[in-house]
């Protein structure tokens, strides 16, 4: 399908709902381009959630109930260099800064063919969850992600377009992923 003929989902978010994973997912209900991400959803996500290791959220099409995308969220803390702290106006002496990590994010291949912006919608929903945590439960300054360049080299551009920047403290220490962060306080002020 021609990318320009795809509908942008960001213009009509009401078409989808975000639901927490409640039971085992059937392998015929979701398929993305990366098999490891399919296997995680089918075989590990529910156990991870039951063990309080990661909460998985499903983006479901309201009309059909089909899973368009999913993300798994976990607690995180990141180290920042002195320059990075200055950039974010952080003068605290804490060794780490509280964050929420998008541990997995995958979009269904069939929905990716029809719509633009599902990944961005998931990042925005993760941001809303982090902001809600800040307002009611615990401090969370950043959303982090380990951009999976092993499976998709262009994923860095996706995260850069969505307001993430590489973490200098972790730069070049990993080869399969690039650690990135997004300042939700800055985003909330926009």
What positions do the PLM features span?
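Non-catalytic substrate-recognition and accessory regions of acyl/acetyltransferase enzymes
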Residues: 1-114, 120-190
């Amino acid at each position: 399908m021609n990318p320009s003929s795809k509908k942008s989902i960001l213009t009509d978010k009401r078409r989808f709902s975000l639901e927490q994973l409640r039971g085992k997912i059937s392998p015929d209900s979701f398929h993305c381009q990366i098999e490891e991400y399919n296997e995680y959803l089918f075989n590990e996500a529910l156990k991870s959630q039951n063990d309080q290791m990661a909460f998985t959220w499903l983006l479901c099409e309201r009309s059909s109930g089909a899973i368009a995308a999913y993300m798994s969220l976990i607690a995180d803390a990141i180290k920042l260099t002195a320059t990075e702290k200055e950039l974010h106006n952080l003068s605290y002496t804490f060794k780490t800064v509280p964050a929420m990590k998008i541990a997995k994010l995958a979009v269904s291949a069939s929905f990716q063919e029809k719509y633009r912006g599902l990944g961005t919608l998931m990042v925005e929903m993760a941001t809303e969850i982090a902001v809600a945590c800040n307002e009611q439960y615990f401090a969370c300054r950043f959303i982090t992600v380990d951009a999976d360049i092993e499976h998709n080299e262009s994923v860095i551009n996706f995260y850069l377009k969505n307001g993430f920047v590489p973490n200098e403290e972790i730069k070049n220490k990993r080869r399969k992923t690039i650690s990135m962060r997004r300042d939700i306080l800055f985003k909330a002020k926009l």
